[in-house]
């Protein structure tokens, strides 16, 4: 049973942050805890933080969170409110230090706007996981013909310095003196003098002035609808509950242009009356609002983003990300694991047949050492088949001496160059085992090599394992030497250095437990194993590789994209006769360049494609739904996607053929219909609605690392990204488990839900201006 996320909410019930936090806890069906010492220690907790609620000073507030984090044993996430900014004046340094300390305690941080995220990035040395979940907005109330607004300019919320009250009062000098100034709210504690100063200024100007004090929720909407000119002139706002409250009351408040306001306009087009960020701009807008009062009301079809339900979905998705996904048992006792969690595989005791495939070329002496080592394996000899795949040697390898100890077969192909990939495929085609264990002819396995290589695969059919290839000088060694070494009667050979890049790769990924899309680089075919079923499903190695190297990276990249689980087995040790290639030659740029050229067209790792070319196999396949688009808006959407260089776009839906015809011979990367097999591309992107991609938007989506990602672009559209990895693994086991592929993707890979503004996605227009 997974414990629900508890919300830690402290402070008076009428405080804006407290009200927001309690509403979100209710919407996500989360328990609320009102004091840190009441939190169950093993329960994930979400903290709604502002320094003003957790201590008398910013330092004291940070101390409270740090103390909680030191005692709490479960995941902590935090929503930060009132993010520090320069306008805090003398308090800025202390508040900055406070928020840094709180961020260090959290696994994930939430803020209410991209503007707030950028403010944090300005003060942070590191780049923590910061998410944006905007403050929710209730559906706007409909305008009633019975309401006749009073001739007043109104500001909502607590009164404190810097919120713009005095500037609004000054800007009203251009209005008739019978237009009053009303503050819907009360002074913040300790700032009653600000209210007194405003009242005195209004009296001096001969302008009506009133303040309501606290207004109960049941009366607030009516009060806001009674005001002629709704204003929010807080010029340092980073997230505003008061603006949202105006909108929910059906009003379209006057707000100064700025980074946060522009962001709100993307999420909720036309919900705000935006004016220039000057007192003069405000004065002009207020005068027009009195002349044209209809512009101060929300349209009847207004649907601001996010609604409370949408915000709750975003939070719920975030909380689910922190929950560990379990493995799923197959009917035959094996398992399918989430992500790359090979550590969740059960212990298997079966000993299925293993086919050891050895590519060979004129290496008789080295082969003799390898075959000798295979006779000493701890895996039952009756469950081992050995296949020597000769890559066109002048003379067939001699294996007669091992016929009594090993079930051994030789298969041959003509000498058409160095074709290790084709040789391995040839050997695999002769395999009768359930598991394929690839081993090079110059790489001598220790006695428990097969056991350590394949045991995980027995329990986990998606696994591709790679052993530990060590390096030694076996020149002059005999078969007898191998026997005395392995049974401990003699010392081992002179050892060469292991490649540091491999050691670091395995250490940094915890033996590939934390594998990502670039971990294919740590899978080497000299010591690689997988199930025969998976190998055949993948189509084996790419036989077009001719020359040394690259075929194992291509295979591992393809396997990972197809949902394979990569695992390094450090106790599966085999000894390569001689140093690593780089150690032996100091590196061979020409050879490595040839390998890179072969790989670039076959794998979609951006690091392999840095020359600005496009390839038939794209990294991203995008499918754009034409519903709701004009030909002009569609080309804007498609063109914005193709800013990502390694992408192809398919358009489908009403008018797709006609739209494509109107574009003429534009960009051969655009096609009509649905793409075919996308399994070798990194991900498929589905785009619905009037969505535009900023310059780096697609790259940012991919860099989340999510295997399934849904992004809301306000209420204008959605973007959904699914990796081929998640799709392929789910399809592989869907029928066996009797579970829909869609549901299995979520069970094995989760589902991230984010907002478009985080990535630079925004809404387009049905008829954008294309003319010049």
PLM segments and residue spans:
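Conserved donor NDP-sugar-binding/catalytic core segment of glycosyltransferases
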Residues: 448-498, 692-726
């Amino acid at each position: 049973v997974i414990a629900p996320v508890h919300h830690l909410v402290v402070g008076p019930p009428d405080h804006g942050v407290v009200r927001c936090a309690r509403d979100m806890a209710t919407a996500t069906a989360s328990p609320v805890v009102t004091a840190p010492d009441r939190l169950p220690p093993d329960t994930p907790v979400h903290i709604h933080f502002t320094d003003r609620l957790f201590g008398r000073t910013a330092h004291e507030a940070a101390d409270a969170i740090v103390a909680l984090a030191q005692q709490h044993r479960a995941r902590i996430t935090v929503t930060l409110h009132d993010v520090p900014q320069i306008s805090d004046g003398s308090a800025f340094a202390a508040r900055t230090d406070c928020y840094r300390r709180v961020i260090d305690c959290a696994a994930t941080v939430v803020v209410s706007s991209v503007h707030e995220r950028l403010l944090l990035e300005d003060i942070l040395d590191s780049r923590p996981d910061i998410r944006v979940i905007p403050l929710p907005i209730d559906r706007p109330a409909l305008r009633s013909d019975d309401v006749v607004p009073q001739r007043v300019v109104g500001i909502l919320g607590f009164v404190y310095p810097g919120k713009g009250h005095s500037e609004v009062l000054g800007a009203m000098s251009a209005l008739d003196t019978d237009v009053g100034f009303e503050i819907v709210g009360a002074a913040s504690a300790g700032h009653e003098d600000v209210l007194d100063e405003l009242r005195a200024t209004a009296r001096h100007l001969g302008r009506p002035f009133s303040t309501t004090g606290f207004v109960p929720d049941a009366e607030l909407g009516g009060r806001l609808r009674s005001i002629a000119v709704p204003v929010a002139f807080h010029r340092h706002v980073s997230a505003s509950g008061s603006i949202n409250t105006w909108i929910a009351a059906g009003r379209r408040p006057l707000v100064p242009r700025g980074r946060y306001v522009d962001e709100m306009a993307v999420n909720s087009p036309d919900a705000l009356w935006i004016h220039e960020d000057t007192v003069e701009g405000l004065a002009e807008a207020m005068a027009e609002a009195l002349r044209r009062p209809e512009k101060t009301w929300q349209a009847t079809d207004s649907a601001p983003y996010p609604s409370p339900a949408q915000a709750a979905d975003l939070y719920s998705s975030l909380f689910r990300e922190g929950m560990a996904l379990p493995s799923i048992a197959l009917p035959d006792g094996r398992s399918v694991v989430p992500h790359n969690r090979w550590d969740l595989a059960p212990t298997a005791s079966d000993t299925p047949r293993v086919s050891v495939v050895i590519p060979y070329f004129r290496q008789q002496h080295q082969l003799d050492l390898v075959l000798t080592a295979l006779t000493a394996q701890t895996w039952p000899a009756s469950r081992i088949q050995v296949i020597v795949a000769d890559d066109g040697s002048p003379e067939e390898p001699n294996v007669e001496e091992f016929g009594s100890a090993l079930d051994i077969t030789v298969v041959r192909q003509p000498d058409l160059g160095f074709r290790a990939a084709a040789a391995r495929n040839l050997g695999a085609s002769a395999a009768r085992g359930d598991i394929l264990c690839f081993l090079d002819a110059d790489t001598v396995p220790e006695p428990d090599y097969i056991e350590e290589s394949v045991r995980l695969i027995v329990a986990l059919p998606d696994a591709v394992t790679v052993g530990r290839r060590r390096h030694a000088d076996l020149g002059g060694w005999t078969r007898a030497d191998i026997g005395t070494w392995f049974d401990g009667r003699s010392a081992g050979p002179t050892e060469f250095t292991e490649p540091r890049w491999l050691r670091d790769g395995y250490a940094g990924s915890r033996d590939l437990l934390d594998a990502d899309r670039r971990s294919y680089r740590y899978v080497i075919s000299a010591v690689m194993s997988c199930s025969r079923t998976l190998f055949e499903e993948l189509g084996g190695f790419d036989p077009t590789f001719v020359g040394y190297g690259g075929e194992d990276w291509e295979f591992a990249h393809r396997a990972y994209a197809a949902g394979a689980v990569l695992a390094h087995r450090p106790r599966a040790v085999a000894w390569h006769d001689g140093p690593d290639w780089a150690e032996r030659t100091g590196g061979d740029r020409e050879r490595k360049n040839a390998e890179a050229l072969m790989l670039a067209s076959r794998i979609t790792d951006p690091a392999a494609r840095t020359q600005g070319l496009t390839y038939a196999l794209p990294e991203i396949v995008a499918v754009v739904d034409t519903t709701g688009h004009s030909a002009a808006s569609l080309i804007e959407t498609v063109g914005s996607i193709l800013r990502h260089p390694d992408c192809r776009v398919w358009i489908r839906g009403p008018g797709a053929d006609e739209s494509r015809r109107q574009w003429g011979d534009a960009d051969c990367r655009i096609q009509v219909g649905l793409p075919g097999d996308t399994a070798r591309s990194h991900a498929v992107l589905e785009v619905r609605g009037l969505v535009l991609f900023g310059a780096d938007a697609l790259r940012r989506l991919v860099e989340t690392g999510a295997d399934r990602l849904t992004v809301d672009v306000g209420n204008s559209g959605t973007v959904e990204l699914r990796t081929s990895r998640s799709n392929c693994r789910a399809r592989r086991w869907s029928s066996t488990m009797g579970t829909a592929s869609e549901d299995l993707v979520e069970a094995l890979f989760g589902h991230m839900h984010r907002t478009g503004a985080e990535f630079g996605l925004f809404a387009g227009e049905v008829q954008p201006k294309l003319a010049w």
